[in-house]
C-alpha cells in the first residue's frame, strides 16, 4: 500500500495533515493559495517536492473557482511569490514558480483569459504525474547502484527524516530507493532516525514503514553512529531540499553529522533527489539560505514543555552537507552522479533560478 498524502481532482485539493500523524489520520481541505501557504508554513505538508506540488495545486484550485478574472497573469505572479516565501530553503517551489510564471506569460500572448486559465491549470496538474514518474526512476537507479556493490546480499539502509510518499506526490525519493529494494526482495532492514525536533522519522517514516511492510527499526538521532558500527549498515540514503552546483546539499538538520559518521565508518552516503531539487545558480552550500524555526518546536512536544523555561534556543531546520562527504553519489531521475559530475550532467536540462 502506498500512502496518499495529496488527494486532488480538478477543483478539489486535500492534504494529509502530517502534524497529527501517527495519532490521527485527517485530511484538510485546501481551498485557496492562502490555505496552501499556511499548510506549507505550518508543516502540515513538508518535503521539498510536496511543497511545490501542494503550493501549485492550491493555485489551481483557486483558478478553477474563477479567481484572477481581472488580471490573471498578475494573480498568478502574486500567488506564486507568496507561496515561494513560505519555506525558502527548499528549491522546488521556487523553480516551479519560475517555470510556471514563464509559461503563463508566454501563453498569455496568444490566449484569452479563460483559455489561459485552462492552460495554467493543465500545467500544474501535470506536476503530479511527473513527480511520481521521476521518483520511481530515482528508486530504481538508487537500488541498482547500491546493489551493484553487494551483488548477492540483502542490504541494510539508514535514512533520516521523511522522504517517502508523504514528502512527494507518491513513491518517494530516498524512501523510494528503500521501496525499490523492498520490491526486489533485497531489503534486509531499514533504520530510521527519529529526526528531532519535529520527529519526522518517528512520526512519518516509521508510519510509512509499518503501513507498507518494510522491515524497519526506529532509533534516536544520537544512536546513528553506533548503528553504523554495530548493525552492518550497507548505505546511508537521505533526501535533499536543495543541491547546489558543487554537490553541497541542504537537508533536514542532522544530515551533516550522519555524513561525517558514514565517512568514518567507510559507508557510502547517498543523496536522493529529483533534478528539480538541484540549483545550479548557487556555487556552494555557503550560499544557501537556512530557514530557522520557532523555539517552541524544540522546547515542547505536542504542546508539553520539555525544556527549562528561559533557555536560549537555536533551531535551524536544515544543515548543509559538504559534497566531499557524499561518497555514494547523488541519485536523480537521470541517473546516479558523483558531486563532481552533477553540474555537467544537469546543465541544459535545468533552468537556473
UniProtKB/Swiss-Prot annotation:
Catalytic function, reaction form: 5-(methylsulfanyl)-alpha-D-ribose 1-phosphate = 5-(methylsulfanyl)-D-ribulose 1-phosphate
Key words of the record: Amino-acid biosynthesis, Cytoplasm, Isomerase, Methionine biosynthesis, Nucleus
Molecular function per GO: S-methyl-5-thioribose-1-phosphate isomerase activity
Biological process (GO), any one: L-methionine salvage from methylthioadenosine
Source taxon at top rank: Eukaryota
Keyword Oxidoreductase annotated: no
Enzyme Commission designation: 5.3.1.23
SUPFAM superfamilies: NagB/RpiA/CoA transferase-like
Catalytic EC class: isomerase
Listed pathway(s): Amino-acid biosynthesis; L-methionine biosynthesis via salvage pathway; L-methionine from S-methyl-5-thio-alpha-D-ribose 1-phosphate: step 1/6
Keyword Isomerase applies: yes
A Pfam family: IF-2B
InterPro entries the UniProt entry points to: IF-2B-related, IF-M1Pi, IF_2B-like_C, Initiation_fac_2B_a/b/d, M1Pi_N, NagB/RpiA_transferase-like
Main location: cytoplasm
UniProt cross-references to Gene3D superfamilies, sorted A to Z: translation initiation factor eif-2b, domain 1 (1.20.120.420), Translation initiation factor eif-2b, domain 2 (3.40.50.10470)
Record-annotated active site: 241
GO cellular component: cytoplasm; nucleus
Site feature location: Transition state stabilizer: 161
Protein location: Cytoplasm; Nucleus
Physiological role: Catalyzes the interconversion of methylthioribose-1-phosphate (MTR-1-P) into methylthioribulose-1-phosphate (MTRu-1-P).
Family: Belongs to the eIF-2B alpha/beta/delta subunits family. MtnA subfamily.
Protein name listed in UniProt: Methylthioribose-1-phosphate isomerase
Gene of this entry: mri1
Amino acid at each position: 500500500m502506498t500512502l496518499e498524502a495529496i488527494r486532488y481532482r480538478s477543483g478539489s485539493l486535500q492534504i494529509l495533515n502530517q502534524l497529527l500523524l501517527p495519532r490521527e489520520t485527517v485530511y484538510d481541505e485546501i481551498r485557496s493559495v492562502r490555505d496552501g501557504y499556511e499548510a506549507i508554513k505550518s508543516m502540515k505538508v513538508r518535503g521539498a517536492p510536496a511543497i511545490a506540488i501542494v503550493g501549485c495545486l492550491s493555485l489551481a484550485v483557486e483558478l478553477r473557482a474563477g479567481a484572477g478574472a481581472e488580471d490573471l497573469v498578475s494573480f498568478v505572479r502574486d500567488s506564486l511569490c507568496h507561496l515561494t516565501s513560505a519555506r525558502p530553503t527548499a528549491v522546488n517551489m521556487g523553480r516551479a514558480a519560475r517555470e510556471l510564471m514563464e509559461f503563463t506569460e508566454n501563453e498569455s500572448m496568444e490566449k484569452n483569459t479563460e483559455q489561459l486559465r485552462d492552460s495554467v491549470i493543465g500545467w500544474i496538474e501535470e506536476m503530479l504525474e511527473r513527480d511520481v514518474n521521476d521518483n520511481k526512476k530515482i528508486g530504481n537507479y538508487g537500488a541498482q547502484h547500491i546493489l551493484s556493490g553487494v551483488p548477492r546480499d540483502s542490504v541494510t539502509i539508514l535514512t533520516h527524516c521523511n522522504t517517502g510518499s508523504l514528502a512527494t506526490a507518491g513513491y518517494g525519493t530516498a524512501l523510494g530507493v528503500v521501496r525499490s529494494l523492498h520490491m526486489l526482495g533485497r531489503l534486509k532492514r531499514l533504520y530510521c532516525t527519529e529526526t528531532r525536533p519535529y520527529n519526522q522519522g518517528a512520526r512519518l517514516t516509521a508510519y510509512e514503514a509499518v503501513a507498507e511492510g518494510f522491515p524497519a527499526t526506529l532509533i534516536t538521532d544520537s544512536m546513528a553512529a553506533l548503528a553504523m558500527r554495530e548493525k552492518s549498515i550497507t548505505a546511508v540514503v537521505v533526501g535533499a531540499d536543495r543541491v547546489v552546483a558543487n554537490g553541497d546539499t541542504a537537508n533536514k538538520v542532522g544530515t551533516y553529522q550522519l555524513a561525517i559518521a558514514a565517512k568514518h565508518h567507510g559507508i557510502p552516503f547517498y543523496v536522493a533527489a529529483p533534478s528539480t531539487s538541484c540549483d545550479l545558480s548557487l556555487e556552494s552550500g555557503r550560499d544557501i539560505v537556512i530557514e530557522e524555526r520557532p523555539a517552541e518546536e524544540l522546547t515542547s512536544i505536542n504542546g508539553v514543555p520539555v525544556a527549562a523555561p528561559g533557555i536560549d534556543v537555536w533551531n535551524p531546520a536544515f544543515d548543509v552537507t559538504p559534497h566531499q562527504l557524499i561518497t555514494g553519489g547523488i541519485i536523480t531521475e537521470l541517473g546516479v552522479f558523483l558531486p563532481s559530475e552533477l553540474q555537467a550532467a544537469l546543465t541544459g536540462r535545468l533552468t537556473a533560478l
